[in-house]
């Protein structure tokens, strides 16, 4: 059976679960958190080109090069959101972005300065 290298792995989910339980002020609410996230994702309609073009806040788009959000899709968003910036983290999936502090933190500092 073929699997996509762009989708989160079982290890990604295990790491996410462990981090939530370790860092959350309410680690016992994890199942409720997952339920709410699932409901939110099920209702996700996305944004139209017109809605993206109306964004006025400074915007930094961050994806991994192995993210399920493709570089092409992120580049389209970059073109649509005025003045936005795009960072593509190497050898990184969607769920691994926050684990790349070595790359992410300097970018965020520059963006927020």
Write out the residue ranges for each language-model feature.
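Flexible "cap/lid" loop of the alpha/beta hydrolase fold
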Residues: 1-18
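Short, glycine/charged-enriched secondary-structure capping and boundary segments
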Residues: 1-3, 74-78, 101-104
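Alpha-helical elements of Rossmann-like donor-binding domains used by nucleotide-donor carbohydrate transfer enzymes
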Residues: 15, 19, 32, 36-39, ...
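Hydrophobic, aromatic-rich cap/lid helix
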Residues: 23-49, 66
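Short, conserved loop/helix-junction motifs that constitute active-site signature segments
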Residues: 52-56, 79-81
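Short beta-strand/loop motif that positions the catalytic acidic residue
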Residues: 54-55, 61-63
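Conserved alpha/beta-hydrolase "acid-adjacent" motif
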Residues: 68-73
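Catalytic active-site module of serine/aspartate enzymes centered on a nucleophile-bearing elbow/loop
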Residues: 84-113
């Amino acid at each position: 059976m073929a699997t996509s290298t762009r989708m989160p792995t079982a290890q990604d989910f295990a790491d996410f679960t462990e981090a939530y339980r370790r860092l959350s002020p309410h680690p016992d609410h994890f199942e409720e958190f997952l339920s709410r996230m699932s409901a939110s994702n099920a209702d996700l309609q996305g944004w139209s080109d017109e809605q993206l073009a109306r964004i006025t806040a400074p915007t930094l788009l961050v994806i991994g090069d192995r993210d399920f959000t493709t570089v092409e899709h992120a580049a389209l968003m970059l073109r649509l959101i005025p003045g936005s910036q795009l960072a593509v983290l190497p050898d990184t999936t969607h769920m691994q972005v926050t684990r790349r502090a070595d790359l992410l933190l300097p970018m965020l500092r520059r963006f927020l300065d």
